[in-house]
Regions:
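Conserved P-loop NTPase motor core
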Residues: 1-451, 459-498
């Protein structure tokens, strides 16, 4: 206890009894995913014990900590005691960027994971491999959607599916083929997922970490399994679901903190009624920002990144290089090996030595290549003599959809009044420009000289792309907020029918 308050932390291995004990304390430390999952499990237990009550009513009672009828339910099943007060670290990441991420409680669908089901997904993947983009299907990269053309639909309808009864119906066949095309065209191994010990493991796009306990819904996970040639697993049934946006909106008192909240102030107020207050810096910032450098070709960008690392390493400055995917971090590592630059890599594949890698990232001569795992909340301390060299230098090799995420990476340098610098290298072939500023990128390419886009032009195109990306993300968050009630009610009806 501290200041008369009881405190306890909660981890994913905790038993229901340990969870109940942790939530009984005055202050409970836990991840948002753990807290929201516990609340969903409580709601499921309550709905099964009180089938006559609507899910909306039960949700309100659980949020307020109102005692539920049925002594055994409260004593043996529920672990939480209401949603009173929450303080959220890195609040913009959770309340804005991950707001639409659905937290799902899944159970066995009851469908057999037999050879027929696996054969259906594999057959759909085979059919998809015979289709040509543009002629047979179109990919909208902005909204990440695949649609069949009339010619593509005819080819799918004419495909030989003898021996695959699941695909006998043309509509179901089209659904699985579109999923297979989405898995092929929009989801890359090394960026969106990894194949680990014969299983598909999703990579969290915000943190760069593996999510071993997560699967995609509605058969898409099975489509990716078929694409990669691993065992097609049994599909899961969604028992209950809620978005972080809806969940945190139920707290009576909500607060949070982050170094990148100012850009999200309007949405935080409109969705959560939370004002944003700026806290003055403890010490003046000494961060030096170098101009954005944009190349037409991705290959030229990577050459420039390696050249910059070599030059900085020659004088002994530590360098942190941020990449957006596991694949990119591994490819850059190979390039650094080719020029004999000692370095360490931190990504979802190489995470076991995370603490040691971060601890050494600020020492003289260190070169660290990392995904978003080295972004938010990472404190890199400078080694002896590094401050005199100019501090940590951060290199971003690609822009994110949100400028706030880019600022989080840049913020690893020049902490607590120390010196530091940041430099951004991009290519017009990057996903951000392909999805959100293809026309502007084409115009910028015409203005390029020797494969390099003028800095002011590059900055303008990047600003347009990020603005469009954020506008789309905001619309999605608004749609989720409106549909969450409908989803909750439909799930509640299904629960009462079981």
């Amino acid at each position: 206890a501290w200041a008369g308050l009881s405190v306890e932390s909660l981890d994913e291995e905790a038993t229901p009894r340990e969870r109940r004990q942790a939530y009984a304390r005055d202050i409970t430390y836990a991840t948002a995913k753990e807290v929201a999952a516990d609340w969903l499990r409580d709601r499921l237990a309550a709905s099964r014990a009180s089938p006559s009550r609507s899910v909306r009513t039960l949700a309100g009672m659980l949020a307020e900590g109102v005692a539920l009828p049925g002594r055994s339910v409260t004593a043996d099943r529920l672990v939480m005691r209401g949603l009173a007060h929450a303080i959220v670290d890195e609040a913009d990441a959770l309340l804005i960027d991950e707001a639409v991420t659905p937290l799902i409680i899944a159970g066995d669908s009851g469908e057999a994971a037999d050879e027929r089901r696996g054969a259906a997904f594999r057959a759909a993947a085979t059919i998809a491999s015979t289709l040509a983009e543009v002629d047979d299907f179109k990919v909208d990269h902005a909204i990440r959607e695949v649609t069949l053309t009339p010619r593509g639909r005819r080819k799918v309808a004419a495909a030989d599916v003898q021996g695959v009864p699941v695909l006998a119906g043309v509509r179901r066949r089209e659904e699985l083929v579109v999923q297979a095309l989405s898995a092929r065209a929009l989801h890359e191994q090394g960026r969106h997922y990894l194949v680990n010990e014969g299983k598909i493991v999703i990579v969290d796009e915000f943190t760069g970490r593996l999510m071993s306990d997560r699967t995609w819904r509605d058969g898409f996970h099975q489509a990716v399994e078929a694409k990669e040639g691993v065992v097609v697993t049994r599909p899961k049934e969604t028992l209950d679901s809620i978005s972080f946006q809806r969940f945190f909106g139920m707290y009576r008192r909500l607060a949070g903190m982050s170094g990148t909240l100012s850009e999200a102030r309007r949405e935080l107020w409109s969705v959560y009624s939370l004002p944003v207050t700026m806290i003055p810096r403890h010490r003046p910032s000494r961060l030096r920002r170098l101009p954005l450098t944009a190349f037409v070709r991705g290959e030229d960008r990577w050459r420039a990144v390696v050249d910059a690392i070599v030059e900085l390493n020659r004088v002994g400055r530590p360098v942190l290089v941020g990449t957006r995917s596991v694949e990119a971090s591994e490819a850059l590592s190979i390039r650094l090996d080719q020029v004999a630059i000692p370095h360490r890599v931190l990504n979802a594949l190489r995470h076991r030595e995370e603490a040691q890698v971060i601890a050494a990232a600020g020492v003289r001569g260190a070169v660290t290549v990392a995904t978003n795992m080295a972004g938010r909340g990472t404190d890199i301390r400078l080694g002896t003599g590094v401050e005199e060299l100019g501090g940590l230098h951060v290199i971003a090799t690609e822009l994110h959809e949100s400028e706030r995420v880019d600022r989080q990476l840049a913020g690893r340098a020049a902490r607590q009044g120390e010196p530091g610098s940041v430099q951004v290298f991009v290519s017009l072939e990057d996903e951000l420009f392909v999805r959100f500023a293809s026309l502007e990128a084409a115009a910028a390419q015409r203005l390029a000289r020797d494969g390099v886009v003028p800095p002011m032009v590059a900055k303008a195109v990047a600003r347009v792309a990020q603005a469009r990306a954020q506008a789309l993300a905001k619309r999605r968050r608004s749609d989720v907020l409106q549909s969450d009630d409908q989803l909750r009610d439909s799930l509640g009806f299904a629960a009462k029918g079981r």
